Amino acid sequence: MNLAERIRNFAAKSPTLAPDAYVAPGAVLVGDVHVGAQASVWFQAAVRADLNAIHISARSNIQDGAVIHVADAHGTHIGEDVTVGHGAILHACKIGNAVLVGMNAVVLDGAEVGARSIIGANALVTAGTQVPEGSLFLGSPGKVVRALTPQEQSGLASWAERYVLLSKAYLDGVPQLFAPPLPSTPAA
């Protein structure tokens, strides 16, 4: 399936992508989706804005197998420099800037995640939950377990930066052995 077949109109709304955004083979975008500068949507991710809008802001990345959807009452807004891990589900929620959403985490309708926070792998952010800025949120159902240190918070955008470099390599056709440097992992 080529890119034109994976970028689908719905109800007279079409996805819009910044010229330097990257959409990997197998990813699908439907309806009122806006993908910002240097943002990326990776293999087998589904971004479906059939009932409301989805905004993926600059330098954010939606990793392999993630699902982004909306509800009648809420769109989904993903801030700048956000990393949405493999298999995560974001449904009708708001994610602040420089947030790391761990692999297989779920964020439900009306939830808001404050900037510079980490949603741990497999965490469940229930509907309407407000996660304060700078929080480490773990568990299912999840809860804030502690505040992130200033050093941990400042390192979160580096994960998104890695994906900006990686998507540029894919766009430029750089050989498979390319590997941008890994950011340091924040302590949990």
Q: What kind of feature is each model-predicted range?
A:
Residues 1-17, 50-58, 64-66, 70, ...:
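Glycine-rich hexapeptide-repeat left-handed beta-helix
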Residues 2-41:
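N-terminal segments that cap or nucleate solenoid repeat domains
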